[in-house]
Amino acid sequence: MVKDNNSLVIKSGFMCGWGAGQDSLIISSTMIKYVYSVPANSQIPEINKARPITDTEWNNILNSINLNNFLNLNYNSCNICVDGCDEWIAIKNDAISHQIRFGMGIKIDSIKPLQDILSQLRSEFRN
């Protein structure tokens, strides 16, 4: 669990080779923003949405993060290098910044609760 830290920002997304598509989800203590685009089709995002985050949502996200576990992960795949897809998660605040990149759809046991929340939010914004 992360202690309540208003400077914490969680970013996640996916990117696929051949301009097939990419998205990003940016979560802070006040806002959730989602952008999805298919670079091969247009420079204009197909989806660009944002909404305020509730205190309950923010607390659930903070409770889903074991920061020590996350900081110890060293995933750095490059499926996009061979026209595949990669997923990424970055966590940053005033004191730390760490990012992992892994094969799209892979569940990592030590961060699965966070991955589940990110997946739910992504589904909400894509519909």
Where are these regions (language model features)?
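Acidic/histidine-rich, surface-exposed loop or edge segments in extracytoplasmic proteins
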Residues: 34-48, 98-100
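Primarily extracytoplasmic ectodomains and periplasmic/lumenal surface modules that are beta-strand-rich
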Residues: 32-33, 70
